[in-house]
Amino acid sequence: MDHFLHIDVNAAQAMMEQKQAHLVDIRDPQSFQLAHAKNAYHLTNQSMVQFMEQAEFDQPVLVMCYHGISSQGAAQYLVNQGFEEVYSVDGGFEAWHRANLPIEAS
């Protein structure tokens, strides 16, 4: 795969349930701590190496940001690092929350 793909929040949730996809949230620490999608990994510049050491490069990775814009750059970065199946979650956490999908809140 040379480029990331787009996925809507409902398809992302279904993929997490079916394929053991990794959901990574690239929002700022305060936003992530306040609320994030259930089982999301907070991917930052500081946690990138740890994520890459733990993740399987052939498992799907779903990238979430605020509204689905910033996640596109991060998704392409992960493709460039060798991840085989990477998706940008359209609408980001905003759409996830509006769809009443599972979240974890502080």
Curated annotation (Swiss-Prot):
Residues 17-105 form the Rhodanese domain. The active site is at 65 (cysteine persulfide intermediate). It catalyses: thiosulfate + hydrogen cyanide = thiocyanate + sulfite + 2 H(+); thiosulfate + [thioredoxin]-dithiol = [thioredoxin]-disulfide + hydrogen sulfide + sulfite + 2 H(+). GO terms for biological process: glycerol metabolic process. It is found in: Cytoplasm. One of its GO terms (cellular component) is cytoplasm. Keywords: Cytoplasm, Transferase. InterPro entries: GlpE_sulfurtransferase (IPR050229), Rhodanese-like_dom (IPR001763), Rhodanese-like_dom_sf (IPR036873), Thiosulf_sulfurTrfase (IPR023695). Pfam families: Rhodanese. Its EC number is 2.8.1.1. Transferase that catalyzes the transfer of sulfur from thiosulfate to thiophilic acceptors such as cyanide or dithiols. May function in a CysM-independent thiosulfate assimilation pathway by catalyzing the conversion of thiosulfate to sulfite, which can then be used for L-cysteine biosynthesis. Belongs to the GlpE family. HAMAP family: Thiosulf_sulfurtr. This is Thiosulfate sulfurtransferase GlpE. It comes from Vibrio cholerae serotype O1 (strain ATCC 39315 / El Tor Inaba N16961).
